[in-house]
Regions:
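N-terminal acidic leader/helix
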Residues: 1-30
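Short, charge-rich amphipathic interface segments used for partner binding and complex assembly
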Residues: 30-63
Length: 66
């Protein structure tokens, strides 16, 4: 695999994570409305984890330029 291909994959993963993060937050709101507080909290934590993963993926992209 080339460096450019790997960069492309990382960019894709960041975008993909963001799509899932947004969806998880939407579903957390729905769970809250249904009175499923424990489910909502865990969905929010999952969304937070995806945000953290994306942060590290962005750091990996920056590392290509170092």
């Amino acid at each position: 695999m080339s460096g450019e291909r790997l960069k492309g994959l990382i960019e894709h993963w960041i975008e993909h994570n963001e799509e899932h993060r947004v969806r998880l937050l939407e579903e957390a709101e729905e769970a809250e409305k249904l009175g499923l507080k424990n489910v909502s909290e865990r969905l929010r934590k999952a969304a937070e984890s995806l945000g953290e993963a994306s942060k590290w993926l962005r750091e990996a992209l920056k590392a290509f330029e170092q």
